[in-house]
Amino acid sequence: MFAGLAKSLFGSSNDRYVNSIRKIVERINAFEPAMQALDDAGLQGQTATFRARLAAGETLDDILPEAFATVREAAVRTLGMRHFDVQMIGGVVLHRGEIAEMATGEGKTLMATLPCYLNALSGKGVHVVTVNDYLARRDAEWMGAVYGFLGLTTGVIVPNLNETQRREAYNSDITYATNNELGFDYLRDNMKFDRAQMVHRPFNFGIVDEVDSILIDEARTPLIISGPTDDKSELYIRVNEVVLQLTEEDYEKDEKSKSINLTEEGTEHVERLLEAAGLLQGSNLYDIENTQVVHHVNQALKAIQMFRIDTDYIVKDGKVVIIDEFTGRMMEGRRWSDGLHQAVEAKEGVQIEPENQTLASITFQNYFRMYPKLSGMTGTAATEAAEFFDIYKMNVVTIPTNRPIARIDEEDEFYKNINDKFGAIARTIREAQERGQPVLVGTVSIEKSELLSSFLEKEGVAHSVLNARFHESEARIVAQAGRSGAVTIATNMAGRGTDIKLGGNEEFRIEDELKDMPAGPERDAAEARIREEVAAEREAVKAAGGLFVLATERHESRRIDNQLRGRSGRQGDPGLSKFYLCLDDDLLRIFGPDTLFAKMMNKNLEDGEAIGSKWLSKAIETAQKKVEARNYDIRKQVVEYDNVMNDQRKVIYEQRGEIIDSETVDDVMAAMRAETVNAIVADACPPGSYPEQWNVEGMKERVANILNLHPPIDEWMQEDAVDPEMFEERLQRMADATAAEKAALVDAETWKGIEKSILLQTLDHHWKEHLATLDALRQVVFLRAYAQKQPINEYKQEAFALFERMLSNIREDVTRTVARIDFQFQEPEPMPLPELPDFLTTHIDPFTGEDNSADVDAGSLGVIADTLPPMQVPKHDIARGENPYAAMEISRNAPCPCGSGRKYKHCHGAI
């Protein structure tokens, strides 16, 4: 009570913070008349002026008011849109590296142009991150007009771009991209052998659109680049056949944690079935020999009992495609790891793709924390404010709406079962359609959306279905969901990022209806007619109550529910929202106080009857908070474990970068040899031991295996002053001499390339193996809890020990490879001489090598060059200042294609 009274008197901390920004907005507004007075050239010249001021020592905060005013005026001139004051407030929040929570329809896309322009002036680049390719393209094209007018470049990263296009987009002042593309490009860059092949540039400033979706909903899913392993498809199929024969008594499942385990009876049943199928070694399922079979049984059991088609995945074109549980979108290209995807493929009878081994991985949590400054925008972030601060150190600031929200949020309505609920929903929708009110229906799965569709068909209600099966038409369906009497069924995706305008989207209508009509007076008249029709329809829809958002059940997260509500009532429009629930809903069935609900429902409700209660709504909200807390703990645990790998990833990627950028790695190779020699001697001659206790035979064996040396160690042991330091010194000298001999067999540039290649390939191989080991460790370390140990602490200790062992193995393997490298020089096969033009004869003196032929017209030399086989270009091209490879994309550190043996940058690339 007292907190509420204090808030009403003094305002919340959010209100006070927003009010402090209003002073900056007043300064921005003061610049507006001056900006309006400038002609186009003058306004465009502001960019050069700002950059000069930054170069002179001013900060971005110093020029913010004038820069924001410049962008506002540029938007008016290019888009016909003027930033509201609340968008200016949001722009300041984003510039400060915070999260702007802004209601749907308030103009987040336009708001982002303010901090984008300001921060791009530094020349270090700005990334705007969106949830899908459509929004990335749309926003880059739409807002690119503002940036282009002010002299800044805009790029967009979407799938199927080649590396040149990606590099060009990343080098733009402002780059729009999806979170997946950014993450995978980062991982791919850190698998390349040449800096010139990389596409990313250093991180600077990122703005994440729909920040809650990317940094929270997708935080549990790591991005993984993987390579294929052995094909085990036959084993998956046979295990699937075994698991299909199990009954409910054979397993216990926990839907809250999405886990399933065999009972004692189930284990015995599985053992009998596996033995009959010839898949069991011995008689005990849990013998060490059956470890792999146990894993396959567990994954098949999970696939069959816990994963549902049209809810967790769909089968499209003979492939199992994952459905995002939060957005309802297909996640093409994503696969469940650890053999689960293959188990689902076996269940559905489609082709089983080989298992993959992780080559590189990162979570979005750790990827986005690499930005020195990161901000975000969304319509729903307040419920997750604590998580945003704990993990990303980002504050959530709620931006006031430009106009008051006029939407009415009605109490939830409860039914006994799903048939009663869907019947009531269908009748409600029919009534809304009859009065011309558009309805957006939110469902949690494809299965539920198609079930509701069948109910609507029985009621004779015309409607559109938007789910993962039809996502290609998502934007257009959602854009027209505000038309009079329109009924749109959507999974949770609900077209985030696409505004639902009352009366429909006039631009889409013009595009669809007039696509074949050429420009001219007739088209102008048709466009005017459509705009008038849309305006009239908008008023009719407002009179009917605005957009009605009807949800068929509550989601695990209140934030997802709020997102759905937020589709209605944009920019002060009227609207209505309501949730319809029943005991069959997953949230109530799995997390709700089921006994109490069931007793009350069965006692007080007749079939088809509904009940609405604030107490029930409060109970649902309590269940949601429990689920949110559990999911937060899971995400926090993901971060804790991934932080361990992230620290190691930084070290490895930093070392890769240093190797790639170094002109020579001789010092690194010498240090690795020295450490390897020291390790060999230390293992054979432990500190404090006597010579007769040393493992001399083991030392000889390792010296031969790793250093490729056969020194007289037995003779050395007979010397008077024998000690480990003597072995280290002599072996080191011999190993260095061997390496020098190898290097002398080729030219210096070639040897540098060989050393780099050995280092990078060895590093990558061991890092890949290390990732697999960490994955395996993570799967089993939780069992340490039974020994009263903290799994995360155990994981940290073991991961560190594994990392040290990996570094030691890298040093040893690099040293071994260099010691055993062998060169085979082959004479090139003679090339047939080209037929020369009749008018030209040449004579090369066999002793001097001089050309004694007569002078020829320089133009004819090009004819000769054209007749030569590919890549055999006359050497005099360099002298003449010509580079025949200029049009080709060749790395400067790659061998020159002319066959000289030198790097491109020292040969034709130097021209």
Curated annotation (Swiss-Prot):
<keyword id="KW-0811">Translocation</keyword>
<dbReference type="InterPro" id="IPR011116">
    <property type="entry name" value="SecA_Wing/Scaffold"/>
</dbReference>
<dbReference type="Pfam" id="PF02810">
    <property type="entry name" value="SEC-C"/>
</dbReference>
<dbReference type="GO" id="GO:0008564">
    <property type="term" value="F:protein-exporting ATPase activity"/>
</dbReference>
<dbReference type="InterPro" id="IPR027417">
    <property type="entry name" value="P-loop_NTPase"/>
</dbReference>
<dbReference type="GO" id="GO:0031522">
    <property type="term" value="C:cell envelope Sec protein transport complex"/>
</dbReference>
<dbReference type="GO" id="GO:0005829">
    <property type="term" value="C:cytosol"/>
</dbReference>
<feature type="binding site">
    <location>
        <position position="896"/>
    </location>
    <ligand>
        <name>Zn(2+)</name>
    </ligand>
</feature>
<feature type="binding site">
    <location>
        <position position="87"/>
    </location>
    <ligand>
        <name>ATP</name>
    </ligand>
</feature>
<keyword id="KW-0547">Nucleotide-binding</keyword>
<keyword id="KW-0479">Metal-binding</keyword>
<dbReference type="Pfam" id="PF21090">
    <property type="entry name" value="P-loop_SecA"/>
</dbReference>
<keyword id="KW-0862">Zinc</keyword>
<dbReference type="InterPro" id="IPR044722">
    <property type="entry name" value="SecA_SF2_C"/>
</dbReference>
<keyword id="KW-0813">Transport</keyword>
<dbReference type="InterPro" id="IPR004027">
    <property type="entry name" value="SEC_C_motif"/>
</dbReference>
<comment type="similarity">
    <text>Belongs to the SecA family.</text>
</comment>
<keyword id="KW-0963">Cytoplasm</keyword>
<dbReference type="Pfam" id="PF07516">
    <property type="entry name" value="SecA_SW"/>
</dbReference>
<keyword id="KW-0653">Protein transport</keyword>
<feature type="binding site">
    <location>
        <position position="907"/>
    </location>
    <ligand>
        <name>Zn(2+)</name>
    </ligand>
</feature>
<dbReference type="InterPro" id="IPR020937">
    <property type="entry name" value="SecA_CS"/>
</dbReference>
<dbReference type="InterPro" id="IPR036670">
    <property type="entry name" value="SecA_X-link_sf"/>
</dbReference>
<feature type="binding site">
    <location>
        <begin position="105"/>
        <end position="109"/>
    </location>
    <ligand>
        <name>ATP</name>
    </ligand>
</feature>
<comment type="function">
    <text>Part of the Sec protein translocase complex. Interacts with the SecYEG preprotein conducting channel. Has a central role in coupling the hydrolysis of ATP to the transfer of proteins into and across the cell membrane, serving both as a receptor for the preprotein-SecB complex and as an ATP-driven molecular motor driving the stepwise translocation of polypeptide chains across the membrane.</text>
</comment>
<keyword id="KW-0472">Membrane</keyword>
<feature type="binding site">
    <location>
        <position position="499"/>
    </location>
    <ligand>
        <name>ATP</name>
    </ligand>
</feature>
<keyword id="KW-0067">ATP-binding</keyword>
<feature type="binding site">
    <location>
        <position position="908"/>
    </location>
    <ligand>
        <name>Zn(2+)</name>
    </ligand>
</feature>
<keyword id="KW-1003">Cell membrane</keyword>
<keyword id="KW-1278">Translocase</keyword>
<dbReference type="GO" id="GO:0065002">
    <property type="term" value="P:intracellular protein transmembrane transport"/>
</dbReference>
<dbReference type="InterPro" id="IPR036266">
    <property type="entry name" value="SecA_Wing/Scaffold_sf"/>
</dbReference>
<dbReference type="GO" id="GO:0006605">
    <property type="term" value="P:protein targeting"/>
</dbReference>
<dbReference type="GO" id="GO:0046872">
    <property type="term" value="F:metal ion binding"/>
</dbReference>
<feature type="binding site">
    <location>
        <position position="898"/>
    </location>
    <ligand>
        <name>Zn(2+)</name>
    </ligand>
</feature>
<dbReference type="Pfam" id="PF07517">
    <property type="entry name" value="SecA_DEAD"/>
</dbReference>
<dbReference type="InterPro" id="IPR011115">
    <property type="entry name" value="SecA_DEAD"/>
</dbReference>
<dbReference type="Pfam" id="PF01043">
    <property type="entry name" value="SecA_PP_bind"/>
</dbReference>
<dbReference type="GO" id="GO:0005524">
    <property type="term" value="F:ATP binding"/>
</dbReference>
<dbReference type="InterPro" id="IPR011130">
    <property type="entry name" value="SecA_preprotein_X-link_dom"/>
</dbReference>
<dbReference type="GO" id="GO:0017038">
    <property type="term" value="P:protein import"/>
</dbReference>
